Structures are given as C-alpha cells and as structure tokens.
Amino acid sequence: MTQAILLCQSHELADSSLAVPFKVHYFGKNQAAFAVRYQGRVYAYLNRCSHVPMEMDFQPNQFFDLTGHSLMCATHGATYAPQTGQCRLGPCRGGLVKIEVSEAEGLVHWHTSDKFQLPL
C-alpha cells in the first residue's frame, strides 16, 4: 500500500531553481533524494548519478545547469532531462531513479512504493 508523504509547500519549488531535498529508504539504505519544478510540474529523483552512484548537486540543492533545462551531475558533467530523468549527455548508464510525486491544494507529496519507503 502506498502512502503520500508531505514534502513541501508548492511555493517552495520555483521553475528551474533550487531543489527540495528529502530522504527515502531504497533497497535497504536511507538515500538522499530531491524534488524540482520544471515547466510548471514537479519531479523527484534519487540524488544519485547513473554513471557513478554519488550525489549530484554541486552546491546544496542546486541541480539545474546554467540553462535551467537540464539536471547536471557536478562530478562528471552528465546531464539529465528534468521531466524523465533520462540521460541527455555525458557519461551515463541509464537515467535517474524516479520517485512518484503529486501536487494538490498548494502541497507537494512523494509516494511510497515497493521500492521507496520512509527512511529508518
């Protein structure tokens, strides 16, 4: 059974701006995750590059490149589509791991699943 877990208020996520960080329990470990807004919609992913499993932000909660149209790994420069997490350019092995989110009545929630649970 899935749960909707409050992440933030909608106004905390501006288009192509800072992310809101959160934690999830994924395959036996607490992992960093982040949510961003792009072209009016909210997306969330594990904070883990698909090239080398390390956190991607080069400054706290900063994932967008200078164009504001790609999420970028600060370590190797791999870029990802904000809408899908798919690799656009650089050393990638697949895409980012997506976390389901919803937005209603001024609130953003992330959703537990068989893969993602509340952190321990």
Question: Predicted segment positions?
Answer:
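Short cysteine clusters
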Residues: 49, 73-76
